[in-house]
């Protein structure tokens, strides 16, 4: 009996393996039968529609995109088939590179003419990041504004309203135009950057809707790094504005972040005024609290605007003549939010600079292979260009350029674009990498000197302080390796060399060194990142420094070491 028990225990794993092999074999048969079921009756694959979905063949009823499983196939077998066991891995196939339309000199001439024509027409392109404390109504405001402008159709609006009602979040219906993931809709908060296009009479605006929750500040930084201007949304209801503006609230931090990343224009939408009965004193009080902080942060009063709105009702967004706006019109006769956005000024673009495109996102295109998105921070790119990915030594060809759902032959500095690339394995494309022309590569550095401004820190910065360094969509561990000098904030003159500590509101020059992570091993060295001095490229020379979930400093790169 003991021998039988021992034999049984030894043979059990073998029997389990045999069952697993049988299940895998059955799963493979199920895959083959399912594929056979997905073809037309004549034996050839069914024709595909433009979007890649299977078209209806003949006069029969339309079928869903999923193949019907064969009879007798268990759920476990279907689950195993989803693992693609036994299938060969698809490898990217090199395609003939597309031909460039223009020689480089002709391309610059074409771009200059187009930009001049755009300015003469008065239709300038500008990117706008929407910021503010969590639950201030950012996504709701932008969703309602798009609807008012006709950029959100009635069918989509109704679908969002029905869907949000089903999950008990009907008040978030307008926000669903931006909050597209299941988790965002279930939690009722924005978690990642959402991008939409909006046309006003004189501007073509790319909207970057940023998350307001402090847990998603890194995503907010990624969006702010792609923006020309900012729209700050604040909640006027009692206690809510104070919660966002006091220490720990995201209103303050978001303003500091966007200014540190080069944004110089900000529009403040004082939202939810209908919930305080359109109280003018409340509106004035909020404006008076924000104005000195905006100046302190570096925003000039001439480039700052305030607009009272009620996003849910659509009051003073694009139309001031609604009957519901009567309580507001009793004391306010200024511009609508649309009027203010229509006057935003995009900064100057340097199309002659070397091409720099920090990758903000990598994804699989529906029809054109691998795609990357990001903002062009210098130069100009056209279809057919061969681009290099740094870090690394991989190259690719630009197959298609898209912006705001429009295909372009070329795109210039300042544009937020999606590039479809060929002749490159997607594994070599990473968020934070930079695309450039092969003969004008961006330098890589693991240490550099920087001029920083220290914010309202509780613990002073000392030599050896470990931090998180943010540069566009990349965040890496780093160390303040040396305190070079404290500086006069106005003149930049050296006040003290080799200080021991840096306290709040201090301007200083420091040396920063990247740190290797625990994942790379104990004896590994830090990997350099693509970065440039501020004097060479302003967009590529700005940095943010965070510690313990708070932004403690921001600055510009002085010299690569």
Predicted regions and their residues:
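Residue-level signature of catalytic and energy-coupling elements of molecular machines
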Residues: 135, 141, 160, 188, ...
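Conserved nucleotide-binding/hydrolysis micro-motifs of P-loop NTPases
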Residues: 213-214, 236-240, 272-277, 311-315, ...
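Active-site phosphate-binding and catalytic loops of NTP-dependent enzymes
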Residues: 170, 179-189, 243, 293-303, ...
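Inter-motif core of Ras-like GTPase G domains
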Residues: 203, 217-243, 251-264
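C-terminal effector/interaction modules appended to NTPase cores
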Residues: 1-26, 33, 37-38, 43-53, ...
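Canonical P-loop GTPase G-domain recognition
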Residues: 275-354
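P-loop NTPase switch module centered on the Walker A-proximal segment
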Residues: 131-133, 139-218, 230-240
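Conserved catalytic network of the ASCE P-loop NTPase/AAA+ motor domain
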Residues: 121, 134, 190, 197-201, ...
């Amino acid at each position: 009996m003991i021998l039988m028990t021992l034999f049984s225990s030894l043979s059990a794993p073998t029997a389990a393996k045999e069952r697993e092999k049988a299940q895998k074999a059955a799963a493979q048969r199920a895959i083959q039968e399912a594929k056979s079921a997905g073809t037309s009756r004549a034996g050839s694959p069914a024709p595909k529609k433009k979007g890649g979905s299977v078209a209806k063949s003949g006069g029969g009823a339309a079928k869903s995109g999923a193949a019907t499983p064969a009879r007798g196939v268990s759920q476990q077998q279907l689950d195993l088939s989803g693992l693609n066991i036994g299938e060969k891995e698809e490898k990217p196939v090199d395609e003939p590179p597309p031909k460039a339309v223009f020689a480089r000199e002709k391309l610059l001439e074409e771009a200059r003419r187009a930009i001049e024509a755009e300015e003469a027409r008065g239709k300038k392109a500008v990117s706008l990041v929407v910021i503010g404390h969590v639950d201030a109504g950012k996504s709701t405001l932008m969703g309602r504004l798009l609807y008012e402008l006709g950029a959100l159709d009635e069918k989509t609006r109704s679908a969002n309203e029905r869907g949000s009602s089903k999950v008990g979040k009907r008040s978030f219906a307008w926000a669903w135009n931006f909050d597209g993931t299941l988790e965002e809709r279930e939690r009722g908060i924005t978690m990642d950057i959402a991008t939409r296009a909006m046309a006003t009479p004189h501007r073509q605006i790319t909207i970057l809707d940023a998350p307001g929750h402090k847990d998603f500040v890194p995503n907010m930084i990624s969006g702010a790094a792609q923006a020309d201007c900012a729209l700050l949304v604040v909640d006027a209801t009692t206690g809510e504005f104070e919660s966002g503006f006091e220490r720990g609230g995201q209103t303050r931090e978001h303003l500091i972040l966007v200014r540190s990343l080069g944004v110089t224009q900000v529009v403040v939408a004082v939202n939810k005024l209908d919930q305080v009965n359109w109280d003018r004193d409340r509106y004035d009080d909020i404006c008076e609290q924000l104005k000195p902080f905006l100046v302190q942060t570096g925003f000039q009063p001439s480039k700052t605007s305030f607009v009272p709105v009620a996003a849910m009702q659509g009051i003073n967004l694009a139309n001031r003549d609604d009957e519901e706006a009567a309580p507001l019109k009793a004391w306010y006769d200024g511009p609508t939010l649309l009027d203010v956005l229509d006057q935003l000024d995009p900064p100057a673009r340097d199309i002659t600079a070397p091409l720099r495109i920090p990758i903000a996102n990598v994804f699989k295109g529906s029809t054109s292979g691998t795609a990357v998105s990001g903002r062009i921070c210098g130069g100009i790119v056209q279809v057919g260009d061969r681009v290099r990915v740094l870090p690394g030594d991989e190259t690719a060809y630009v197959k298609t350029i898209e912006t705001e759902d429009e295909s372009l032959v070329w795109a210039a500095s300042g544009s937020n674009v999606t590039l479809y690339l060929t002749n490159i394995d997607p594994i070599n494309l990473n968020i934070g990498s930079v695309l450039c022309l092969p003969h004008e590569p961006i330098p890589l550095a693991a240490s550099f000197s920087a001029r920083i401004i220290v914010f309202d820190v509780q613990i002073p910065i000392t030599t050896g302080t470990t931090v998180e360094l943010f540069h566009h969509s990349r965040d890496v561990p780093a160390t303040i390796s040396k305190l070079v000098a404290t500086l006069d904030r106005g003149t930049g003159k050296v006040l003290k060399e080799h200080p021991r500590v840096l306290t709040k509101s201090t301007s200083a020059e420091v040396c920063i060194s990247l740190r290797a992570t625990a994942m790379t091993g104990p004896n590994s060295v830090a990997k350099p990142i693509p970065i440039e001095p501020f004097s060479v490229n302003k967009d590529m020379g700005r940095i943010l420094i965070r510690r313990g979930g708070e932004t403690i400093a921001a600055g510009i790169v002085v010299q690569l070491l």
